[in-house]
Amino acid sequence: MCIRDRLHTELELMRMNARRTRHKSQQTGGEGNLAKILMTSALHRTRELAGAILGPEMILWGEEAATGGVIQEMAIFSPAPSIYGGTDEVQRNIIGERVLGLPKEPGPDKDTPFSELLQNKTDW
């Protein structure tokens, strides 16, 4: 798929999800979580696409860069949204539990004090 088609596909996916979210009849309750996952995924793919377009220029920084470093800053920043606001894994767990009705992952009781939590425990 050519670069133009990839960009168009990215934009259309984001546009269709936003349109679906606006219609109350199609809301599931996990729109915010899904939007965050889609946004972080789009940022990662955009970074990869920028690298494909710029090639070796992608490693240049500041005034030496063809874009003045804007694309490079985006590339450095792109992993951050998948962490802040709850990791993508946490967002997927929320969607699974609240929207799809899947059981919660096993873990300690909510009332367990932090000091009593075991490190690296695997057999909850």
Per-region residue spans from a language model:
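Alpha-helical interface subdomain recognition
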Residues: 1-124
